[in-house]
Amino acid sequence: MKTKRILTTGASLVVAALALAGCSSGNSEAAAGAQTDSGGKITVWVDPPRVPAAEAFQEAYPDIEIDVVQIDGTVGGKTVKQSFANFDSAGSGWPDAIFFPSNDDIAWATNSTSNYAADLTDLLPDVIEGYDPAVLSFCEIDGKIRCLRNDAAPDVFWYNKAFFDENGYSLPTTWEGYAELAAKIATEHPGKISGFLGDAYAVNRYLQGSGCPTNDRVSETEAHIDLGDPACVRATELLTEMYDAGALSTQGIFDGDAAEAGANLVMSPGAVWWGNYLFRDTWKIPAGQMSAVAPLAWEGESKPSTGNEGGGLWGVSSHITGKQLENALTFATFVATDPRWQVDLSVGLPGYGPLQQRWLDKQRKAGYLAEFDDAAAAFVLAATIVRPDRDYTRYNTGTVWTHTITPALTSGRSFTDAWSTFGDRLIREARTFGYAVQSTA
C-alpha cells in the first residue's frame, strides 16, 4: 500500500519524522553507521514543489511501497538540518531519499559527522553520464558524486522585449553596459527596475556571476573568503552604481508583494526557471513580452560569466542496502531522468542532458516567451558555463545577505555600508560553522 504523509514545519516535523524512523530503517535498533534493509519500503522527503515528482513516481511504480513526507522548503531553513542532527545522534530515522530544501544542505549532509548522502559515482554511473559536467559539478565533493541535480538553473539575461522595442534600446552584452543602461532607464522611465537585491539568490546573480570568492571550499574545515578580491570589487561597484541610480529593487523575488515590482522589471540576470515560475505563474506577465539572451561578459573578458540559482539537489541515504537501496536508487533515477516529471511537470530546464530538448520543445509549443529560439539557445549555453568557483558550504551566504544587505538598504543605508556589514557577518558565520577562514578582507 502506498501512503503519503504531509508534515508541517518546525518541531512537529522532527517528532513525526522520528516516528517514521521504523518505516525507513527496517531495524530501529541498528547502530549508527550500520546499513539496514527494510525489504523494499522507502521513505522520501520532498518540499511542496517536488510533491508532484513523488506522486508521478508512485503512479509509475505502484509496486514500490513508499512514504512521501512533505517538508519545509524554505531556502536557508534549519528544520531539516535539525531533524538530521537528531537522526545522526539516534543512529536511525533518516529518509531514504530527499530533495534538499537548500543546495547548501549538501555540505552538512556529506561532512564526516553526518555522511548521510551516498556516493553515487558507482551506484548510478549511467545517470551521471547523462549530465554535462558543468551542471553536475556542484554535486562533486572531494572527487565523489554525492547528489543529482533536479534542474539546471543557470542565470541568463532576461529582458522585456516589448519595452525594449517600444523605446528603441539595444541589449547590453557586458555587465558594465548593463549597469550603464539600467541607470539610463531609471532616469528616463522612473519606476522601471533592472534587478532585485532582496533575496538570497542575489548572491548568485551578482557575486557568483563575477567570480567573487564567498564560498571557496578548501576542505571540510577550511574556506577561502576574500571580499577584497577584484572580482568582488567590480561586483560591488556595479551594484552601487545601479542602486544609487534607483535601478534596483530592495525587494526579493519571492516576496509576496514583489509582483508589482516584477511587472516593472525591464532586464536582469536571472535563472532559467524565472520564465515559467516567476514571469508566467507568479507575476502573471502576459505572454510574448519576456525573452532571454546569453549571459553577460565582463569588459576585458572574452567569455560570458554567470551564476546559478538553485537547481535543487536529490540525495540518497548512505545508511541503507539491499532492496531498500535499490528502490531508493530507482526513485532517484526517476526524479532526475524521467520525462513524466522532468518534462511534463517541472518548470525548469532539466539538469539531465538527454531531456533538455524535449523540455524546450514543450516550452516552444506553449508560446509564452518572445524570441524563443534566442532564449532556448541562451538556456543551453548558460548551463555549460556557470562559474565553477562557488562551492556549497555549511554557512549560507544567501541567508547572511538577506540578514544584512536587505535590512540595511531598506533602512536607508548606502550599499557601501551594507556591504561592509555583510562581509563582517559572512566571515563570522563561516567561523561559527567550524571553518578556518582564509581571508584578506
Regions found by a protein language model. Give the residues of each.
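Conserved N-terminal structural module of periplasmic/extracytoplasmic solute-binding proteins
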Residues: 2-107, 171, 323, 343, ...
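Short amphipathic alpha-helical coupling segments at ligand-binding clamshell hinges
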Residues: 53, 231-238, 322-335, 418
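Short helices/loops that flank or line small-molecule/ion binding pockets
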Residues: 78-94, 110-112, 163-164, 183-187, ...
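Hinge/lid segment of periplasmic solute-binding proteins
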Residues: 102-154, 291-294
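Extracytoplasmic/periplasmic solute-binding protein
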Residues: 141-142, 146-150, 155, 179-225, ...
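Short glycine- and hydrophobic/aromatic-rich loop-to-beta-strand nucleating segment
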Residues: 155-159, 314-316
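Glycine-centered hinge/linker elements that transmit conformational signals in sensory
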Residues: 182, 222-251, 294-298
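C-terminal lobe and pocket-closing loops
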Residues: 275-286, 299-403, 433-441
